[in-house]
Amino acid sequence: MTARYLRLQEVQVELAVDDVFLRQVCDEGLVEIKHTVDDEAVISVDDAERLRVITVLMREMDVNLAGAEVILHLRDDVSAMQRQFDEILRALVEELRRRIGGPTR
């Protein structure tokens, strides 16, 4: 799957994020800024969403950057566990269908 990218300047305006804050977030490895062949700064849609979550946590919930980092990692872990659970459940359903002779996908 190909990642979609947004212009960094537009994301910064939308989220009211300044260059200093963005640099801090990038230095912590929470988001990654890339550059096009025309040297335009872009950010992936996923990283733009991560940046939005960070700004909400920090502005509205008074969480510091280190706390936001922990929350993002926990959020990623929960998402990974959910995907694993879904895969296990799918495999279990397929096995049950196979054993009882039901239709499979």
Which sequence ranges carry the predicted segments?
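Arg/Lys-rich, alpha-helical DNA-contact motif
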Residues: 2-9, 13, 23, 27-28, ...
